[in-house]
Amino acid sequence: MFIRTFPSARVLARVSLANVLHVWQGLGYNRRAKYLHEAAKTINDKYNKYNKRFPDTVEEIETLPGVGHYTARAVAAFAFNKPEVFVETNIRTVFFYHLGPRRKLSDQQLLPLVERALAQSRMEPREFYAALMDYGAHLKRQGIKLNAKSAHYKKQSAFEGSTRQVRGAILRELLKHHSTLATLMQRIPRNQQDVANELSRLMAEGLVALHGRYFAIQE
């Protein structure tokens, strides 16, 4: 649905953030949709700087909003078939499953192993990573959950009753219409301080703006 609606960076850059968030619903953190929207605008605005349709080096990709070290390498590998090395949750699962480490390992310890496996593979980089991630997802579907062996592992809190739930509720209301603080507090069945706190955070992140007495999705 998202790709069908916004098939290119140029199309995505020309729509409002509210439009992006509406289509993004159910696809994950709304902050990521905002970063993607901003990245599309950056690519569109700096077309002449890159002298091509899309930045294709890790260094260029890392300049895009919200793109970090590993994400830039994942984009380079999948979009441009470059032999960049990165680790994500399903890749960790595969290596932990076959290594069976007795102690927790960091991504820095896993990266040389991924690099060696990629170099020895007869597959193209994008095929290698697609297969690796599909395999990791398959292991998880079989009930094999090993990410606790990662030195970076943090157990995610339950969604029910979380601040993530409050943020989602606020954005859903504001996608329908502009609202005052009093209206939001009335419509969202949570502690009023929680609603106020998350509104402040959403404003700080550039997802929500205040126009007089009314809150709205940032334009």
Description of each model-found segment:
Residues 189-203:
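Short amphipathic alpha-helical interaction segments
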